[in-house]
């Protein structure tokens, strides 16, 4: 329900809505299509989770941020990796180097395929 509010504020202020999803999450389709996936620009959309942490370290972000487990905060103790059933290290190794076990490749390739609709603009008839 936050998206209409964000866009109302952006329109009023003449701004764009910025996204916070990274390449690892986007590749896996780990976002809500018209929720956290709704934005105009995404400055970190091409960075993997590994690269986001490297970026944070480079700019001396507080240690508490750099060591926090990625979580959508949906419930106490929830983690992205727990929900995905795969680690971001495994995802990033595959995305960056093409290196993964057969099981990991299958998992990622399946997610890439079944979440394609989340990554496309609205389809409508001509």
Describe the function of each predicted region.
Residues 4-126:
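ATP/NTP-dependent adenylation/nucleotidyl-transfer catalytic domains that generate, transfer
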């Amino acid at each position: 329900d936050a998206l209409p509010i964000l866009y109302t504020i952006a329109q009023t202020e003449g701004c764009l809505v910025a996204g916070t999803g990274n390449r690892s999450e986007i590749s896996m389709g780990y976002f809500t299509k018209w929720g956290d996936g709704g934005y105009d620009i995404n400055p970190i959309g091409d960075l993997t989770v590994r690269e986001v942490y490297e970026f944070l370290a480079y700019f001396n972000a507080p240690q508490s941020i750099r060591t926090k487990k990625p979580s959508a905060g949906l419930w106490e103790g929830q983690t992205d990796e727990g929900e995905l059933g795969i680690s971001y290290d495994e995802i990033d190794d595959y995305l960056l180097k093409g290196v993964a076990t057969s099981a990991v490749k299958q998992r990622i390739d399946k997610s890439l395929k079944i979440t394609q609709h989340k990554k496309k603009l609205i389809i409508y008839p001509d």
